[in-house]
Design a protein with these regions (language model features):
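Short amphipathic alpha-helical heptad-repeat segments
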Residues: 2-10
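A short linear-motif detector with a strong N-terminal bias
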Residues: 8-9, 16, 120
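Scaffold helices S1-S3 of the voltage-sensor/voltage-sensor-like domain
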Residues: 13, 17-20, 41, 47-48
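Accessory alpha-helical DNA-binding modules that contact the DNA backbone or grooves
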Residues: 29-160
Length: 160
């Protein structure tokens, strides 16, 4: 596994925990883990398990998680979160201006769980009822959703 792939696993866990309203320090620990792996100049997967703690910012707990990822390709906590977490919420982070905090707000206040829910809420002008969201953001999100839909449609017409 490449460092970026390993870091993405930690980022996924951090995003799901943050959207789910988990403890700030726990979320930050997973974000720091992703950063430590991403910033490491050589392949983490090529290190012997007993050398993981040589990576700046990696303690015994993170070293154990790294060993699990290298051995299994995933983290048990990520697998468990994916079982219970609405996958559509994670897909929303690919849209501009939507990070975990804003996605949590949308889920909590407007019960948005996926792109379709978001599109309906934007078209109804519901986002502007939330502080920090406005008409301009609604327009940009609608454009992003339309572009995404256009890309998907173009892909479908090209593929047999």
């Amino acid at each position: 596994m490449r460092n970026e792939e390993i870091a993405r696993l930690f980022d996924d866990v951090a995003d799901m925990l943050e959207i789910g309203g988990d403890n700030f320090f726990r979320v930050r620990a997973y974000r720091n883990a992703a950063r430590a792996v991403r910033d490491y100049p050589s392949s983490v997967a090529d290190l012997a398990h007993d050398r993981f703690q040589e990576i700046p910012g990696v303690g015994s707990d993170l070293a154990a998680k790294l060993a699990t990822i290298i051995d299994t390709g995933d983290l048990p906590i990520r697998i468990e979160l994916l079982r219970t977490f609405p996958l559509g919420l994670l897909e929303l982070k690919n849209l501009p201006m939507l990070g975990p905090k804003r996605i949590k707000l949308l889920a909590d206040r407007l019960h948005i769980r996926n792109r379709d829910d978001l599109k309906r809420a934007v078209e109804a002008g519901q986002l502007r009822t939330i502080r920090g969201f406005g008409a301009r953001m609604e327009e940009q999100l609608l454009e992003a959703l339309a572009r995404e839909l256009g890309v998907l449609c173009d892909t479908e017409t090209v593929l047999p």
